């Protein structure tokens, strides 16, 4: 049985490099990881709940992938939290298209970010 491991990382090149080294160390053991990989969550703790930080974080991750072939192979995707309108609201505020959970990028910023990321890739 090959083991799988989950870790929480931040968005920096150094954190991705440290994770890569951690996975390499694990793979040198007698029980290596089945498929070392990471999907970076650009929101939540990485953004400090500041939804617009997802834009910078996403671009930083792509930059890290361009700087290192090993990081490029390790990173399988980004998780960007978006909704129709920017931000969030409390339950009962009745603002159409705004999240009632975590703050999100609105549709327009999400669409722009996806196009920018495609150009960077």
Residue spans of the language-model regions?
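Active-site beta-loop-alpha junctions enriched in small/polar residues
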Residues: 43-47, 78-85
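Single conserved hydrophobic/aromatic residue that forms the stacking wall/gate
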Residues: 1-9
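Structured alpha-helical segments in the cores of large, soluble enzyme domains
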Residues: 12-32, 65-67
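Structural preference for beta-strand elements that scaffold enzyme active sites
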Residues: 37-39, 74-79
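A C-terminal functional module that forms or caps the active site or interfaces directly
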Residues: 55-68
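Conserved, mostly hydrophobic/aromatic
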Residues: 40, 106
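Short glycine/threonine-rich loop-to-helix capping motif typified by GTGT followed
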Residues: 47-58, 88-93
């Amino acid at each position: 049985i090959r083991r799988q491991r989950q870790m929480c990382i931040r968005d920096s090149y150094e954190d991705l490099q440290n994770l890569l080294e951690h996975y390499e160390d694990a793979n040198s053991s007698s029980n290596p990881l089945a498929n070392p990989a990471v999907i970076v969550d650009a929101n939540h703790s990485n953004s400090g709940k500041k939804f617009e930080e997802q834009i910078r974080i996403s671009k930083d991750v792509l930059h890290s992938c361009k700087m290192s072939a090993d990081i490029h192979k390790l990173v399988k995707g980004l998780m960007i939290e978006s909704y129709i309108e920017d931000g969030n609201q409390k339950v009962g505020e009745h603002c159409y298209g705004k999240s009632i959970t975590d703050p999100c990028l609105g549709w327009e910023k999400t669409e722009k970010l996806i196009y920018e990321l495609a150009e960077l890739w």
